[in-house]
Amino acid sequence: MMNRWSALFKGDRVLWILIGLLMLSSLPLIYSSTGQLALRKYDGDTERSLLAHGFKLLLGGVIMLFAHRIPYLWLGRLSAWGVYIGCAILAVTLVYGQTINSASRSLVIPFTNISFQGSDPARFFLILWLARGLALLQKDERIRRFRDGWMHLLGGLMVTAVLIAPENLSTALMLLGVGIGMIWVAGARLVDLTKVVVGGLLVVFLLVTVAYLAGWPRARVWKNRMESYLSPTPGQEDFQVLQAKIAVSDGGLWGKGPGKSIQRNFLPHAYSDFIYAIVIEEYGIAGAAWVLLLYLGLFYRIRKIAMNARSPYGAYIASGMGMALMAQAVVNMLVSVSAMPVTGQTLPFISHGGSSILINALAMGVILSVSRDMTGEGDWSELDIEGESQTNKGGDAVPSKGEVSYA
């Protein structure tokens, strides 16, 4: 029986277990927190909300199984096309996207009722593209140089962020942070990175100020969220923040118990943006610590995979995907406990959602593919960064490092 499971779930088994625990932990939370959603979409049938969420988790699991069996080095040749596809999706979303909560973030697939956030696939494709570019720069020993080194990667990162920012500033800033983090991990000089970060912050501040003075609606939303965070008052703009604070303060050490949340009936988006507040209300500090430890464990395993990857490309993929997932989780938790302004970020594998679950599952599948190569369960040592056999090019195959233990 164990051999069957081992044959099905290859790579880092601890990573598989942690992802599974996050998914299982989400089920009672979604069932409890989707009352408002069920009233709007399912005539009050919360079981349908739970089944819909469970189906997305199951589909995410299938995607992980499929993705972790694909040699991650094959993704190198697809990454250039992928980043163009991601930017095209973002551009179409800006023009034809479905407006939700005063922001055009979702794109509806024609002839279906299925929608997805364009920033999710764009982020995935961009990280693959950055990882490939950084691996090639390291190979040519140009990662320490800016102008004839990683400047073009910064350009692609900025273009993607600019396309995301008008409707989702927090995601754009997080993506910029992940991209800069990947460049730093690859070995870029700290002085160059510091100049880029300082200059970027000044540009963002200038653009947001100009947008607000020009009367752009989204800029007003950003301003209102900052004001709500800095000086909350019992008004409509601060309703979410105040309700989340009540949920957190009522949780105590052990919480009210599963399904006994009161604030879920008043807190908008209790099943997505503020689900961590429901975790604290129902399961207390103990439940909040459990969820946090799962994410920390996930990040620790991904970090070990990145450090022991058998190619720079695999290391940068794992680093980028891991940073992106952890940043999303941390931001959601900080917002839920009123430690930062409202952003609209969901909690990976726990919040109710479609594209976020599926893209994060795909990202974890790719990381598991990297770990599968490390354990010797994927014999990809003869592939180069483009997924082509180096033996077929007339050279000797890359020597295998053997099985790597990272338990």
Regions found by a protein language model. Give the residues of each.
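Membrane-helix boundary/helix-loop-helix interface segments in multi-pass membrane proteins
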Residues: M1-L22, P28-E167, M333-P348, H352, ...
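Hydrophobic alpha-helical transmembrane segments
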Residues: F55-G60, E282-F299
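Hydrophobic alpha-helical segments of polytopic membrane proteins
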Residues: A80-W81, C87, F146-I164, L169-L213
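Hydrophobic residues within the alpha-helical transmembrane core of Major Facilitator Superfamily
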Residues: A91, I180-G181, M326, M364
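Hydrophobic, glycine- and aromatic-enriched re-entrant/interface helices and adjoining loop segments
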Residues: I100, S104-S106, V196-W290, R310-I317
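Alpha-helical transmembrane segments of multi-pass membrane proteins, especially transporters
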Residues: D120, R144, D148, H152, ...
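Interfacial segments of multi-pass membrane proteins
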Residues: L173, V178-D192, I262-G287, G344-L358
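Loop-to-helix entry and N-terminal half of a specific, functionally important transmembrane alpha helix
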Residues: I305-G344, I350
